[in-house]
C-alpha cells in the first residue's frame, strides 16, 4: 500500500501530461504526441516548424520537423532533440539550430521547457527565411532581389529557369503521348503525367505565364576554358581509349549487330572440286606403294572414302601349291571392285571355290581400315578368275620379284560363266549349311562380308 501510494504521488508530481495538453491546445493539429506507458517509457513529440509570415505560405521558404524525445525523469533530465526533413537549410545551419536548442534545454533544466524549444525553432527559421544553396537547374546561388519560387515540396528555383524547364518537359510529354497513341491505339488510355519536380519528382503546381514574366537572372555567362591539367587528362584518356580499341576492349555496337548478318545479295563463291581418284583404272602407282608407305596409306584412305561401304572388303592371298600347304609370305590386301548400280538390289553372293588360294574377309575389322604396306617383297595381286581345266594344273603360281610388278589386275565383273561347279555336286543339289557365324547372310544395318573357301576346305 505504501509503494502504490508513492507511485501515485509521483504521477501527480509529473508535469509532462499537463504540459502536453497545453501544447495540443496551442498548436492543434500541428502537434503529434506518441505517449509511452506511463513513466516506464519515454514520450515522443513531433511538430513541423515554419517561419512566422502571418500565415503566408508562399513566403515560407524554409522548414524542418522538430522531434523531442522526453525521458521519464523529465523535467530533471534534458529531452533528446533531433531535426528531420529540413528544407532550404544547409548542413551548417542545421547544426547551428541543433546547438541553439540544446543550450535552451540545458538552461531550463528542472522546469517545463517544451514550449520554449518549439518557439526557439520558429524564431530561428524566421530569421533565416532565405533558401540556402543553388538553383538545381542553373547551379547558381540565389542573390538578393532575384525572382525565385518555391514548390510545394520546398524546393527552390529561379522563375526564369523553372519556366524553361516546364516548357521543355511539356514538349517531351506531348511527343511521348503521340508515340503511345500510335503504339497502343486499342489499349486502355493511361493517366497523363504532368510536369514533375526535377529534385523529388513530385507533381508541380505552377503558373507558366507568371514564371515567364519574371526577369532573367543577371548571372555572367562564363565560357568553359580547360586548364593545363584538364588537357593532360584528356590526352591520357585518348591514349587509353586507342590502346583499348587496338586490343579489342571497345565494343562497337554497330559491328556487333552485323556480326552474324548474312547477305543474300552476293552469291557464295563456287567451291573448288577436289581431285577425284579413278578407282576403276587403278591410278595409284606401285612404285609409290613400295617406296612410300605414308603416301600409300593416304591413297587408300581416299579410295575408301570414294567407294561404297559395302564394297570395301579385303582379299587375302596365300601362295602355294594347294589349299593344304602352309601359308607363305605376308598377307597382301587389295580393295575389291564395287557392285555396279545396274545390277539392281544387292543379293548375297554365292560361295565360289578358287584354285591356288582363298579369299576371306578379315573379321573384326571396320569397313574403312587403313591399308598396310607390305614389309617384304610385294606379291602378285590375286586374280579372282580361276584357271580353265583345259590348260591343266601347272602347280602353284610363281611369285614374281619386286621388279616384275605388273600393276593391279584388270577390273572384272562377276560373270557366272567363268565359274565352275564342284565336281561332286549336281544342279539340283544344295550346299551344306554352314555353322552359325560363318558366311551366313544376316540382314541388318551393316552388311557382313561373305567368306570364300576352297573346295576341299568346305
Swiss-Prot record:
Its EC number is 2.3.2.27. Gene3D superfamilies: Ubiquitin Conjugating Enzyme, Zinc/RING finger domain, C3HC4 (zinc finger). Residues 282-299, 362-372 have a biased composition (Polar residues). Zn(2+) 2 binds at residues 153, 155, 197, 200. Residues 432-443 have a biased composition (Low complexity). GO terms for biological process: positive regulation of NF-kappaB transcription factor activity; protein ubiquitination; rescue of stalled ribosome; ubiquitin-dependent protein catabolic process. It comes from the Eukaryota. Residues 267-299, 317-458 are annotated as: Disordered. It catalyses: S-ubiquitinyl-[E2 ubiquitin-conjugating enzyme]-L-cysteine + [acceptor protein]-L-lysine = [E2 ubiquitin-conjugating enzyme]-L-cysteine + N(6)-ubiquitinyl-[acceptor protein]-L-lysine. Signal peptide: none annotated. Keywords: Cytoplasm, Metal-binding, Transferase, Ubl conjugation, Ubl conjugation pathway, Zinc, Zinc-finger. Pathway: Protein modification; protein ubiquitination. It is found in: Cytoplasm. SUPFAM superfamilies: RING/U-box (SSF57850), UBC-like (SSF54495). A zinc finger (RING-type) spans 135-201. Ubiquitinated; autoubiquitinated. PROSITE patterns: RWD, ZF_RING_2. Interacts with UBE2D2, and may also interact with UBE2E1 and UBE2E3. Interacts with RELA/p65. E3 ubiquitin-protein ligase that plays a key role in the RNF14-RNF25 translation quality control pathway, a pathway that takes place when a ribosome has stalled during translation, and which promotes ubiquitination and degradation of translation factors on stalled ribosomes. Catalyzes ubiquitination of RPS27A in response to ribosome collisions, promoting activation of RNF14. RNF25 catalyzes ubiquitination of other ribosomal proteins on stalled ribosomes, such as RPL0, RPL1, RPL12, RPS13 and RPS17. Also involved in ubiquitination and degradation of stalled ETF1/eRF1. Belongs to the RNF25 family. This is E3 ubiquitin-protein ligase RNF25. The gene is RNF25.
